[in-house]
C-alpha cells in the first residue's frame, strides 16, 4: 500500500475517497485545499496544506490525484494536474473495484473511474478525467484529456469526445460522432450530430 495525497477538498473529494478506500491500494496521507481550510477534515482526512505546500509534501509522498470536481470548466483540474506533474508526482489512475473496464480498453494517468462505471472494449480514456458513477463509455469510444463524463451518462460506440469537455449527467450521444474540445453537454441532453469545439448544448 502506497501513500497518496488528494488535491481538492470539496464534494468530489468525498467520492474519490470512497473509491480509494474501496480499491485499498493507497493510504491517504491528507488533502491539499485552500489555505483557510487547513486543519479541517473531509471524511476524517485532514487538510494538511495548500498548493504552496505540494513541493514539501512530495518529499515524503510521491503519488497524488486531483480531487477538484469539474462542472463545466476544466481549467482548475487541468492547472492542478500540470502543477503536480511539474513537481514530479506520479498520478495513478484510481479505479473502483465496482467499475468494469474491459481488458481491451485503456485509462490514462490521473483518471478516476467511479463505482458502477463501464468502459467497454476498444475504448480509450485520456488523462485526468472523471468517469463518474454509472457512466457508460461504449466500445471504441475515445475520451480526451481533462474530460468529465458525468453520472449515468452514455457515450456510445465510436464517439470521440475531445479534450476538456463536460458531458453532463444522463446525457447521451449518437454513435460515431465527434464532440469538439471544450464543449459543454448539459445534463439530460441527446447529442445526435457532431459538434464543433466550444459547443454548448442544454436540455
Task: Indicate where each model-derived feature is located.
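Glycine-rich adenosine-cofactor-binding loop
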Residues: 2-20
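Residues at the starts of beta-strands that form the adenosine-phosphate
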Residues: 3, 27-29, 63, 90
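Alpha-helical elements of the RecA-like P-loop NTPase motor core of helicases
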Residues: 14-18, 75-78, 145, 193
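Short, solvent-exposed amphipathic alpha-helical segments in soluble enzyme
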Residues: 20-23, 81-83
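NAD(P)-binding Rossmann-fold cofactor-contacting core
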Residues: 23-41
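Phosphate-bearing ligand-interacting subdomains
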Residues: 38-96, 100
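Structural signal for interior beta-strand "rungs" in well-ordered beta-sheet cores
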Residues: 93-203
Amino acid at each position: 500500500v502506497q501513500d497518496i495525497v488528494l488535491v481538492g477538498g470539496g464534494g468530489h473529494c468525498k467520492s474519490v475517497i470512497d473509491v480509494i478506500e474501496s480499491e485499498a491500494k493507497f493510504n491517504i496521507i491528507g488533502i491539499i485545499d485552500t489555505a483557510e481550510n487547513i486543519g479541517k477534515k473531509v471524511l476524517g482526512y485532514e487538510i494538511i496544506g495548500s498548493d504552496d505546500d505540494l513541493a514539501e509534501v512530495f518529499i515524503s509522498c510521491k503519488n497524488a490525484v486531483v480531487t477538484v470536481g469539474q462542472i463545466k470548466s476544466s481549467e482548475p483540474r487541468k492547472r492542478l494536474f500540470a502543477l503536480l506533474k511539474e513537481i514530479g508526482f506520479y498520478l495513478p489512475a484510481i479505479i473502483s473495484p465496482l467499475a468494469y473496464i474491459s481488458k481491451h480498453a485503456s485509462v490514462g494517468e490521473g483518471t478516476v473511474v467511479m463505482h458502477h462505471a463501464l468502459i467497454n472494449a476498444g475504448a480509450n480514456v485520456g488523462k485526468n478525467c472523471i468517469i463518474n458513477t454509472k457512466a457508460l463509455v461504449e466500445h471504441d469510444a475515445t475520451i480526451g484529456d481533462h474530460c468529465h463524463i458525468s453520472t449515468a451518462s452514455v457515450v456510445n460506440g465510436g464517439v470521440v469526445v475531445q479534450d476538456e469537455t463536460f458531458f453532463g449527467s444522463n446525457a447521451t450521444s449518437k454513435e460515431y460522432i465527434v464532440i469538439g474540445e471544450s464543449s459543454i453537454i448539459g445534463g439530460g441532453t441527446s447529442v445526435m450530430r457532431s459538434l464543433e469545439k466550444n459547443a454548448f448544448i442544454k436540455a
